[in-house]
UniProtKB/Swiss-Prot annotation:
GO molecular function, one term: ATP binding
InterPro entries to which the protein is assigned, alphabetical: AAA+_ATPase (IPR003593), ATP-synt_VA_C (IPR055190), ATP_synth_F1_bsu (IPR005722), ATPase_a/bsu_AS (IPR020003), ATPase_alpha/beta_chains (IPR050053), ATPase_F1/V1/A1_a/bsu_N (IPR004100), ATPase_F1/V1/A1_a/bsu_N_sf (IPR036121), ATPase_F1/V1/A1_a/bsu_nucl-bd (IPR000194)
Top-level EC class: translocase
Subcellular location: Cell membrane
CDD domains the UniProt entry points to: ATP-synt_F1_beta_C (cd18110), ATP-synt_F1_beta_N (cd18115), F1-ATPase_beta_CD (cd01133)
Stated name of the protein: ATP synthase subunit beta
Topology in the lipid bilayer: Peripheral membrane protein
PROSITE patterns: ATPASE_ALPHA_BETA (PS00152)
Family listed: Belongs to the ATPase alpha/beta chains family.
Binding site for ATP: G151, G152, A153, G154, V155, G156, K157, T158
Keywords: ATP synthesis, ATP-binding, Cell membrane, CF(1), Hydrogen ion transport, Ion transport, Membrane, Nucleotide-binding, Translocase, Transport
Enzyme Commission number, as recorded: 7.1.2.2
Length: 463
């Protein structure tokens, strides 16, 4: 027996629907509103009174009017999962939007699911090797961890994301899910075609709810991407989940909260900010079967790190990767700031004494170089003591050795991409710190993989 209701009020994306008081739909149930030539999906958010519910539309409410029929589907929004989703582009409801033909999947999961229980979770901290030297050495990622990716426009966030997708696919046989939350459609379009060109698309599922979508879609699209990731994790895969941008998830939640009439909290955000963020982040974790490692681009409004949105996000992050414009100006890519980026995994009990010592010494030498730069700018390098000259020489080599050619950027740079295992990364930097390569020109260190590549380059330069 189908449970039908009638639309009694529409205010933008908010729809009030009257049902029989005996058959009120459950919270978070999906409703189908028949709008003639199309069906609009809405999600139940509140029960108001004995026989009325308030729902938020997941699609445009254009063309809806009072008196239209709404069908209670009896379950929450469900999206397709499984290997069929790879290489395809979906919206919040799991419908393909890439125009690449029909789509069928054997299974679908509801987007609202409980986080794994304590017994199911894997608590052993394990390094997630990315093959990117600057990340693996100074701010390593945790398997099943959450990483914040900070950076302005044009500093290389997208290329870094693509390289991570490429590396997890090729080196770990893992899969990726990219979730575009409230960002520009043009950027999503560019990313889709760049992924197609660089060959990583068939190992990735993409889910988009962009800036032009209603707030309900932007609020729930992160859950759609997460649900697809959870399926792969439960099948024993290591999954990389990208969320771009986590701030827009909070922003959409704030819009919905205001539309539902909740009293705003600090800086106008929703009073349920911490709860909503926790419900999303707690589902991103490793279990005994597989892992979801999440990389989340974080927009910081007005560069204010104390704003409730980024501040709530920070509480959940295990590592931060900060991209710096000053480093792009030096022509060093990836433009990761080695001193600003950090990780909870940089602990001798997890990564081992040798790796920890090398990382700390690299940070110290770069910090000292930063302090000396003012003196060099005013007096010149010749005025430095012999010890400081040595520090500057090694720091400049380290700075250049932190650069690396990326596989996904081969067609632009003409350089073959390099994947560097952690062991090789630590050994290379240890040798530079010990002064074994003080006689090699610093230009030989730029855009190389291992220290052997540097020595080869130096030999070629001598010829």
């Amino acid at each position: 027996m189908s449970n039908l209701g009638k639309v009694i009020q529409i205010i933008g994306p908010i729809i009030d629907i009257k049902f029989d008081s005996e058959n009120l739909p459950d919270l978070f149930n999906a409703l189908e509103i028949n709008a003639g030539d199309r069906k609009v999906i809405a999600e139940v958010e509140q029960h108001i009174g004995d026989d009325t519910i308030r729902a938020i539309a997941m699609e445009d409410t254009e063309g809806l009017k009072r008196g239209m029929e709404a069908l209670d589907t009896g379950k929450s929004v469900s999206v397709p999962v499984g290997k069929e989703v790879l290489g395809r582009l979906f919206n919040v409801l799991g419908k393909p939007i890439d125009g690449a033909g029909e789509f069928t999947s054997e299974e679908s999961y509801p987007i609202h699911r409980p986080a794994p229980s304590f017994e199911e979770q894997s608590v052993e901290p394990e390094i997630f090797e990315t093959g990117i030297k600057v990340i693996d050495l100074l701010a390593p990622y945790q398997k099943g961890g959450k990483i914040g990716l900070f950076g302005g426009a044009g500093v290389g966030k997208t290329v870094l994301i693509q390289e991570l997708i490429n590396n997890i696919a090729k080196e770990h046989g893992g899969l990726s899910v990219f979730t575009g939350v409230g960002e520009r459609t043009r950027e999503g379009n560019d990313l889709y075609y760049e992924m197609k060109e660089s060959g990583v698309l068939e190992k990735t599922a993409l889910v988009f709810g962009q800036m032009n979508e209603p707030p309900g879609a932007r609020m729930r699209v992160a859950l759609t991407g997460l649900t697809m990731s959870e399926y792969f994790r439960d099948q024993g895969q290591d999954v990389l989940l990208f969320i771009d941008n986590i701030f827009r998830f909070t922003q959409a939640g704030s819009e919905v909260s205001a539309l539902l009439g909740r009293i705003p909290s600090a800086v106008g955000y929703q009073p349920t900010l911490a709860t909503e963020m926790g419900a999303l982040q707690e589902r991103i974790t490793s279990t005994k079967n597989g892992s979801i490692t999440s990389v989340q681009a974080v927009y910081v409004p007005a560069d204010d790190l104390t704003d409730p949105a980024p501040a709530t996000t920070f509480a959940h992050l295990d590592a931060t990767t900060v991209l710096s414009r000053a480093i792009t100006e030096l022509g060093i890519y990836p433009a990761v700031d080695p001193l600003e980026s950090s990780s909870r995994m940089l602990d001798p009990r997890i990564i081992g004494e040798e790796h920890y010592e090398v990382a700390i010494k690299v940070k110290n030498i770069l910090e000292r170089y930063r302090e000396l730069q003012d003196i060099i700018a005013i007096l010149g390098i010749d005025e430095l003591s012999e010890e400081d000259k040595l520090v500057v020489g090694r720091a400049r080599k380290i700075q250049r050795f932190l650069s690396q050619p990326f596989t996904v950027a081969e067609q632009f740079t003409g350089m073959q991409g390099k994947y560097v295992p952690i062991k090789e990364t630590v050994r290379g930097f240890k040798e530079i710190l010990e002064g074994k390569h003080d006689n090699i020109p610093e230009s030989a260190f730029l855009f190389q993989g291992t220290i052997e590549d540097v020595l080869k380059k130096a030999q070629q330069m001598e010829i």
